[in-house]
Regions:
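A surface/extracellular/periplasmic glyco- and lipid-processing/surface-interacting theme
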Residues: 2-9, 17, 34-104, 111-374
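Hydrophobic single-pass membrane-insertion segments
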Residues: 21-36
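Alpha-helical transmembrane segments
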Residues: 14-22
Length: 374
């Protein structure tokens, strides 16, 4: 009887052992595998734990940085530019400073047959820029299309209205004052009238902006489309030679761009004088020129100190002009759908204007006149 019981026990353990062996094999216990041999499964839960360091392995995600392909500016930069009003009265043009550091300069007609400019600076450390002058009502809209901080030394009444309408960040010397620890200062190396002695600098403007908590970054790109390759207009449809460009704003102010074939840049002259930085002696020059023919009128209800009606420019709309680079010019159209929108430049065939890598002067010129291009 006992022998029969032993046989039953043995058979029982054999059966149980077989079942356990089958299960262990099925579960890969003897296969040499482990859980890390299986493909990882994505974690579908939100885990806010900082796992940037696991053991000695750094698994911090990296964001690739793309080097800028442009030299005029870092195209990946989000630095907000400054748009600074520049005094172009002929007496003051001889003491101008800093314009060669601007990525763009816009030049507009104003009263008395003169012009006034906006110089745009981005990621620069220029300490002497000027001389600075007041705003007109059309100027702030062009600063706005760059999302720039607008810098001016006063404004006429319509200009103040435009600044209020746009709610644009601006720095006005009439409010901040000028002097030590101010965003503006005066310097008079040529013994000129006081209105021709106001300067600023990026260092001063940044210090002031930080003290006022101005937004210093932007996602807005300039309205120009830059080409990574050299723009050669010589064989383009409708292109003409452009070695000398003359804009006669009035009998008392004439502007000339002369092409330097060695540098492939245009050098500026005003009233037959070389236009240069008073403090460095460097000639103001440019790689690109854009001419915009615009409608010029007057503001009936406001006059300047001399009793002259302020000029007005029709900001929104469209018109014709020229893009000029490397010794050639080609006719273009410009379109600014609203006062607050960016200007779009196209050739007459509808294709997009791409400008050369370099600075650009944009000259707004009365459409009732003609720019001479030879």
């Amino acid at each position: 009887m006992k022998n029969k019981m032993y046989i039953v026990y043995i058979l029982f353990f054999v059966v149980i052992g077989g079942l356990l062996g089958y299960l262990l094999i099925d579960l890969d216990v003897f296969s040499g595998k482990n859980e890390n041999d299986n493909p990882p499964v994505a974690n579908t839960t939100t885990d806010k734990t900082d796992n940037s360091q696991i053991g000695n392995i750094d698994v911090t995600p990296t964001t690739p940085t793309t080097p800028s392909k442009l030299t005029i500016m870092d195209e990946n930069s989000k630095t907000r530019p400054y748009a600074i009003m520049i005094n172009n009265y002929p007496a003051a043009m001889k003491v101008q400073a800093g314009l060669n550091d601007a990525y763009a300069v816009y030049e507009f007609p104003i009263e008395g047959g003169m012009s006034r400019s906006i110089a745009f600076f981005k990621d620069k450390t220029t300490t002497k820029i000027g001389t600075c002058r007041s705003a007109r009502q059309y100027h702030p809209y062009y600063a706005y299309e760059h999302d720039a901080i607008y810098v001016h030394w006063g404004s006429n009444h319509p200009g103040s209205d435009a600044i209020s309408d746009l709610k644009i960040t601006h720095i006005d010397a009439n409010s901040t004052g000028a002097g030590k620890n101010k965003p503006f200062y005066r310097e008079n190396p040529a013994k000129l009238a006081t209105e021709h002695t106001g300067y600023t600098g990026i260092d001063r403007l940044l210090t002031y902006s930080k003290s006022k908590n101005h937004r210093l970054t932007t996602d807005t790109k300039p309205p120009f489309k830059y080409s990574y390759e050299d723009v050669d207009l010589s064989s383009a449809s409708g292109a003409i030679k452009a070695n000398t460009i003359t804009l006669k704003y009035s009998g008392s102010y004439s502007l000339v761009y002369e092409y330097n074939s060695s540098t492939k840049r245009y050098e500026r002259k005003y009233n037959k004088k070389v236009h240069k930085d008073y403090f460095t002696g460097k000639v103001f020059d440019t790689k690109n020129i854009i001419i915009e023919y615009v409608k010029v009128g007057t503001v009936a209800e406001y006059k300047d100190a001399a009793g002259t009606n302020y000029l007005d420019i029709t900001v929104a709309g469209s018109g014709k002009g020229y893009y000029i680079t490397n010794g050639y010019a080609r006719e273009i159209t410009w379109t600014k759908e609203t006062k607050k929108s960016q200007t779009v430049y196209k050739y007459l065939d509808g294709s997009e204007v791409k400008i050369n890598d370099g600075n650009v002067y944009v000259n707004f010129f009365n459409k009732s006149k003609t720019v001479s291009i030879k």
